[in-house]
Amino acid sequence: MKSGRFIGVMSGTSLDGVDVVLATIDEHRVAQLASLSWPIPVSLKQAVLDICQGQQLTLSQFGQLDTQLGRLFADAVKALLKEQNLQARDIVAIGCHGQTVWHEPTGVAPHTLQIGDNNQIVARTGITVVGDFRRRDIALGGQGAPLVPAFHHALLAHPTERRMVLNIGGIANLSLLIPGQPVGGYDTGPGNMLMDAWIWRQAGKPYDKDAEWARAGKVILPLLQNMLSDPYFSQPAPKSTGREYFNYGWLERHLRHFPGVDPRDVQATLAELTAVTISEQVLLSGGCERLMVCGGGSRNPLLMARLAALLPGTEVTTTDAVGISGDDMEALAFAWLAWRTLAGLPGNLPSVTGASQETVLGAIFPANS
């Protein structure tokens, strides 16, 4: 069974940077050693946003974007190696999630698409890469997401305490770690995605730092109720979603009914949308004693305060409190999934994704020996 140093690479739907994590992994433990966040050039970020919202590209443009993202991921890995004074031979493999540009797990031909050419990463780093983690699960009838609950269960499940892990990235997803029950998990809806899109359009800021804008505004209750009527929120699990659904166009359609509103009030309403949709799903799933939050949203003081207020009797904390950086959780999970793939172990949980069976995930892109 392969063990040793692995690197996880994650570029999520929030597009706030490429997260790279170095960890030692074996069958008994996952020990994080180092991490860094690598910036995404504005031009690449905009290209990804455009394609996620349905803008048409030529095949040439699409191929260029795939290559550019692969090179970006390789640069991020090389920066971490240099920082840690490590060589390619010191790393067993890289687990690279890729950049999701479309996720459509239902319909006549279910599919999901993550780009960022893994061949570029292998060629530029000299390290074996495991990628394309989601499509095997979809081929077996699953949603292909979320995949991280399996990792949450391995690291954070408790024999007696009802726990849930909440990742608030661009999309928010919940892992249900309830003693005596199969692991559950699904996307609750927008996390930071709509908040980030709104403040970017209104103020040119990538995100609402310390929720300053949201805290300066007031929740527009009719707008909140209008958004909460979206059918996704009442859809039963398993379910997953992404930027192809909850995007700026989605927000604009709801705002048409509310002309002339204060932009800060919209920001406050979007924060409340995220908090309410998450808390409702926690309660519908039977509640928990401890809700451990990770992802960029765990650094949003307003979101954390609202979750605590909406979930009385639940200890709302970050995963930092149990020794795992909330900023690095997803990248660490894909390092772990790469280890499982090389070990020939399944990486999905049918109780979460709805797949017909457990399966080894991903494709292996071997480095030259």
Curated annotation (Swiss-Prot):
Keywords: ATP-binding, Carbohydrate metabolism, Kinase, Nucleotide-binding, Transferase. Its EC number is 2.7.1.170. It holds the Pfam family AnmK. ATP binds at G12, T13, S14, L15, D16, G17, V18, D19. Pathway: Amino-sugar metabolism; 1,6-anhydro-N-acetylmuramate degradation; Cell wall biogenesis; peptidoglycan recycling. It catalyses: 1,6-anhydro-N-acetyl-beta-muramate + ATP + H2O = N-acetyl-D-muramate 6-phosphate + ADP + H(+). Disulfide bonds: none annotated. GO terms for biological process: 1,6-anhydro-N-acetyl-beta-muramic acid catabolic process; amino sugar metabolic process; peptidoglycan turnover. GO terms for molecular function: ATP binding; kinase activity; phosphotransferase activity, alcohol group as acceptor. It comes from the Bacteria. Catalyzes the specific phosphorylation of 1,6-anhydro-N-acetylmuramic acid (anhMurNAc) with the simultaneous cleavage of the 1,6-anhydro ring, generating MurNAc-6-P. Is required for the utilization of anhMurNAc either imported from the medium or derived from its own cell wall murein, and thus plays a role in cell wall recycling. Belongs to the anhydro-N-acetylmuramic acid kinase family. HAMAP family: AnhMurNAc_kinase (MF_01270). This is Anhydro-N-acetylmuramic acid kinase. It comes from Escherichia coli O157:H7. The lineage of its organism: Bacteria, Pseudomonadati, Pseudomonadota, Gammaproteobacteria, Enterobacterales. The gene is anmK.
